[in-house]
Structures are given as structure tokens and as C-alpha cells.
């Protein structure tokens, strides 16, 4: 799997304009929609239990994000996820803050038990808590811990029968057999709320057009990281507000050629 092959997935997303159904959180809804539009995907945010199953059935991908967790949204996620499974629509799950509270952890473990996932994406602490491994977490954005990230990712992929994506200073993608580390990105992403949540939805757009989910995730993470690097280079003296605007620009403007030039991946 070379960089040229990976970079072509970006062009495929833009040519296909996939519909990505998001059941996401109130903090990031606008940013997620704008990010997907900038990339070239078509976002829809449908939450009502009366329509989520139908909407999920016609989407290219379904993204479930439990950032601002409420019981009615959990019900909607389960309805949408089961419909997606029946209709062969890939489901991505972002277990935001798993481990922070008992309710949040319970939901984070219940959803993968009920729904077949194409991708689970979170920081190391979140993924560890989904599979009931001890890992310290403080708040929904915490990711620091003392475990082995690659080991946790492989364990999650095996136990949940999915592709596990753990993001941090470096990003890990694995299906339990193939394991790749992506080394693109920029620390200023942590200063803008919703960049992780948007990333999961961007992976959804890539998964909608590339059925090798490992390849799709690698392509999405590399694209996202390169776009962040290019945006940071243009706004380094200005701060996170300017970065956020420029990042949306780079989601629209970063090309497959940029990915070939700047992408950094390592197979381990």
C-alpha cells in the first residue's frame, strides 16, 4: 500500500460526494458539517428516532458520536446503526469520553455489542475503556495514559471485530493484522474543539467510497494531518481562531499530490 494508492482515495471522495449521516454532539455539529462540505462530502445531521433508520439506510456511511450524551440520542444511534447494518452501510463509532462516567462507559460498551462497526475511532483512553482495559482518563478529551497504544488498538480490533483507529501525537490504524502508524498532524488541532469529532466523520466519507477500511482510514488520517500541517504553516503567528478558518480552507484545497508529497506513514 503506497502513498500514491492512498492519495487516490481523496480524489474518489470528491468525485463521489458521499452522503455521511452524522448523529453527533451539539458542540461540533456546525464544524463537522462545514468540514465535510469543504472536503467534498455531503453531510446530514438527522437525530429523530422517527427517521434515523430510513436516513441511515440511504447513506454512504453512518457516524455515531456520543460527545453530548442523552438517552434519546442513544436510542436513535441504536436504531440507525441496526438499519445501517441491514443495508450494508458502514458504521463508525466515536466513544467520546468513555471511562469518564459510569453511564458514558456503559453506553460506549453497549453500542459495539449491538451494532457491527466498520471503524471505532478515539484516543487511547477512550478505546481502552470501551474494551474494559484500565487507562486513566480525566474529562472527555483526555488521552494520556501509560499503556501501549498499538497493543490496545490491536486488542480493540480483535475483540470488536472492527478497524481500530487511535489518534494522538501519532495515529494508529489496525484491523488486528495490518498495523500502520500515521505521523502527520499538528498540535494546534488540540486547541480547536471538534477536530477529533470531525476527523471521525471525515473517515466516514472515505469509508463510504473505499471498502478496504484500513486503507480508507489511512488515507483519511493522512489527508487530515497534511491539511492541518498546511493550515498551521499559514497561521502559525495568529492562533487557533485563524487556524480553524484556514483548516477548513485546507480541507477543500489539499490535493492528492500534497498527500503524496507530505504524507508520513509507517507499517509496523
From Swiss-Prot:
A Pfam family that the UniProt record links to this protein:
HK
Query: Which pathway does this polypeptide act in?
Result: Cofactor biosynthesis; thiamine diphosphate biosynthesis; 4-methyl-5-(2-phosphoethyl)-thiazole from 5-(2-hydroxyethyl)-4-methylthiazole: step 1/1
The reaction(s) annotated as catalysed by this protein in its Swiss-Prot or TrEMBL entry are:
5-(2-hydroxyethyl)-4-methylthiazole + ATP = 4-methyl-5-(2-phosphooxyethyl)-thiazole + ADP + H(+)
Metal-binding keyword on record: yes
Give a GO biological-process term: thiamine biosynthetic process
CDD domains for this protein: THZ_kinase
Indicate whether Kinase appears among the record's keywords.
yes
Report the sequence similarity comment from the record.
Answer: Belongs to the Thz kinase family.
Note the HAMAP family from the entry: Thz_kinase
UniProt-recorded name of the protein: Hydroxyethylthiazole kinase
What species is given as this protein's source?
Bacillus cereus (strain ATCC 10987 / NRS 248)
* Organism classification: Bacteria, Bacillati, Bacillota, Bacilli, Bacillales
Query: Which gene specifies this protein's sequence?
Result: thiM
Amino acid at each position: 500500500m503506497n502513498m500514491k494508492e492512498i492519495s487516490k482515495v481523496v480524489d474518489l471522495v470528491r468525485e463521489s460526494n458521499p452522503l455521511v449521516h452524522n448523529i453527533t454532539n451539539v458542540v461540533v455539529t456546525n464544524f463537522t458539517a462545514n468540514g465535510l462540505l469543504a472536503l467534498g462530502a455531503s453531510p446530514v445531521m438527522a437525530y429523530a428516532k422517527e427517521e434515523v433508520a430510513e436516513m441511515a439506510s440511504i447513506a454512504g456511511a453512518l457516524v455515531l458520536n456520543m460527545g453530548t450524551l442523552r438517552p434519546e440520542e442513544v436510542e436513535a444511534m441504536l436504531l440507525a446503526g441496526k438499519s445501517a447494518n441491514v443495508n450494508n452501510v458502514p458504521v463508525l463509532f466515536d466513544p467520546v469520553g468513555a471511562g469518564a462516567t459510569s453511564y458514558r462507559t456503559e453506553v460506549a460498551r453497549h453500542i459495539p455489542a449491538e451494532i457491527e462497526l466498520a471503524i471505532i475511532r478515539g484516543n487511547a483512553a477512550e478505546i481502552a475503556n470501551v474494551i474494559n482495559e484500565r487507562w486513566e482518563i480525566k474529562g472527555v478529551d483526555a488521552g494520556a495514559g501509560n499503556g501501549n497504544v498499538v497493543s490496545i488498538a490491536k486488542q480493540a480490533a480483535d475483540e470488536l471485530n472492527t478497524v481500530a483507529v487511535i489518534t494522538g501525537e501519532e495515529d494508529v490504524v489496525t484491523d488486528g493484522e495490518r498495523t500502520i502508524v500515521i505521523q502527520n498532524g499538528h498540535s494546534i488541532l488540540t486547541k480547536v474543539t471538534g477536530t477529533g469529532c470531525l476527523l471521525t466523520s471525515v473517515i466516514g466519507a472515505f469509508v463510504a467510497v473505499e471498502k478496504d477500511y484500513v486503507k480508507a482510514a489511512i488515507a483519511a488520517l493522512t489527508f487530515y494531518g497534511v491539511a492541518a500541517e498546511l493550515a498551521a504553516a499559514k497561521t502559525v503567528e495568529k492562533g487557533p481562531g485563524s487556524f480553524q478558518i484556514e483548516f477548513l480552507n485546507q480541507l477543500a484545497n489539499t490535493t492528492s499530490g500534497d498527500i503524496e508529497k507530505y504524507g508520513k506513514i509507517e507499517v509496523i
